[in-house]
C-alpha cells in the first residue's frame, strides 16, 4: 500500500523525506534509517532519497557532516550530481521552514475573475509551486509542490536562453501523456508565453510548459530545464 501511495499520491514522497529529516534532527537515527530504507526501496528513482539513505548507512560507522557526505574520490567523480542533490534538499527544507503567511495570496491573484477556479504561483527562489483555489470565499492555498525551472534561472527574454518566463500566464491546453514522449512524464500544460506584454517588450521563444518527469527520474534538480516548469509525476 505504501509503495503504491508513494508512487501516485501528490506530495507524499516529499512528506516522508521531510519526516526522515525531522527524525535525524531529533537524534532518532534508528527510526530514520528504517523509514529511509523503505522510501528508497519503494522509489529507487528518487535520487535524493537514495542519497539520504546512503548517509544514514554511513552514519552507523562514521560521522556524517552533510547531505551526500561520500568519500572524496566518489565526490570528485560526481561533483555535479552531488551539488544538484544538495541544492534540492536545501530547497525542500527551505520551503517547509518559510511557509506563506496564512490567508495571504500573490497580488496578481487579487482581481481574478470568478470564472478562474484555480491559480498557480511559482516561487523559483524556493523551487516551489503553490496551487490556489478561487472560491466564493476568496483564494485559498490548496497545496504546494517542489519544482524545477530553467538552467539559467528566470526572466526569459529570448528563444534558447534556458530561462523560465517571469509574468502572468494562462494554461492554454492539457496534453495527455499518450500524445507525448516519456520525457514529459505524466502530461503537460502549455502556457501562453509569449503573452501580449512579452511581445511588446520584444521577448521571443515558445513551448513553455508545466510538465512531469521521465520515468527514470523522480525529480529534477532545482535548475535543470530549458525554460519549462517541471513537477514530479505524482504532483
Please name every model-derived segment:
Residues 57-105:
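Alpha-helical linker/edge segments of TPR/alpha-solenoid repeat scaffolds
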